[in-house]
């Protein structure tokens, strides 16, 4: 008797696309959490010093 030939493995495109989008969203979430944590720890480092305006107080 001949051995049955193995069936070709079909890639489910929908499942692959869903998994890729899920991984991308997880990476995006991790990056955003890290950025937000950095801003919370040191909020003034995120502001460029060129936008700071000196206040002139008139006496």
From Swiss-Prot:
Cellular location(s):
Membrane
Would you tell me the Gene Ontology cellular component terms? membrane
Q: Mainly localized where?
A: membrane
State whether keyword Membrane applies.
yes
UniProt-listed InterPro entries: Cortexin
Residue spans crossing the bilayer: 17-37
Tell me the membrane topology, using the record's own terms: Single-pass membrane protein
* UniProt entry keywords in alphabetical sequence: Membrane, Transmembrane, Transmembrane helix
Using the chain's own numbering, where are the disulfide bonds?
Answer: none
Q: Pfam families from the entry? A: Cortexin (PF11057)
Entry protein name: Cortexin domain-containing 1 protein
Organism for this UniProt entry: Mus musculus
């Amino acid at each position: 008797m001949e051995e049955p030939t193995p069936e070709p493995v079909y890639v489910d495109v929908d499942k692959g696309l869903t998994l890729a989008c899920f991984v991308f969203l997880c990476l995006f979430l991790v990056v955003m959490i890290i950025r937000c944590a950095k801003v919370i720890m040191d909020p003034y480092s995120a502001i460029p010093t060129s936008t700071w305006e000196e206040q002139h107080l008139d006496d």
